[in-house]
Amino acid sequence: MKLSRRQFGMTIGAGAIAAAYGRPGWAQQPIIIKYSHVVANDTPKGKGALKFKELAEKYTNGKVKVEVYPNSTLYKDKEEIEALQLGSVQMLGPSTAKFAPLGAKEFEALDLPWLFKDDETYGSAMKGPLGTWLFKKLESKGILGLAYWDNGFHMVSANKPLINPSDFQGLKIRISGSKIADRYFRDMGSIPQIMAFSEVYQALQTGVVDGCENTPSNYFTQKFHEVQKDITVSYHAHLQYAVIVNAKFWKALPADVRGQAEKAMNEATDYTNSIAQKENEEALAEIKKSGKTTLHYLTDAQKVAWQNAMHPTYAWAKSRVGGEVLDLIAKELNVKMN
């Protein structure tokens, strides 16, 4: 029987575990978990990945070795999910919008503007039936979801102040790929541009794109604020990550090792989500202190104008993500999704 590339990668991953445990001296050959992500080590996700490494290696007494590859050093964000499915990497932490190309468009509902009022509301929602239901959408793709990690709320920037919806007219704004984000920026009159995270700084610097949206920690660690004259602290949409693993690899782990790794992940998740807000506040303070950009804050009336401009995205979203996930969100948040 000829194996596909995906089957081959998964077989190799599971086989490596069996080999490590099936021969004398396996302790000298720890199980390797490669964790690839696209942001810096000193962001909430970066620190969370390092915390998982620390705890997983501690709890398994060295039976597991976690190799963390930040800043797209192993795979770019548009490559990493296929690499996970092929078994070339075992763990990722992509933004949830990255699952739409797999057929799991429902995750994009989390990108709706003004959906979560704060980090606590987001965290509570994802710990409930909504988070479980969404992860089940990945199982048929050979992927298991382990945790949701918070990264705070988006700001948006350009080389001019973005105060009123009309200020967005004709601007090329980089987005990560979410069709929901694409829609709400189009509702504001801009032209969304999908681009790998590792390419954004140069694109901003050279004018390939006019602006972008992201969280304060990502702006600061990637130095986006150094090549954007103005940033609006709008907090118009939430950015969340899902920590996922190659299902065959994870299920092939010995039960005791898997349990210890899951304990490490649970604790790393609590840690990551507990520091996200503080990390973003500190990053925003550093951006302000740098003097390299001007920060703008919306008045209540200006915020309402943005909300009204982006509101058509909600009606459109039902055709994109389906009514079931919107109903789940409405129930979880006790809000009307219209």
Residue ranges and their predicted role:
Residues 2-19, 23-121, 129-132, 136-338:
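N-terminal secretory/targeting leader peptides
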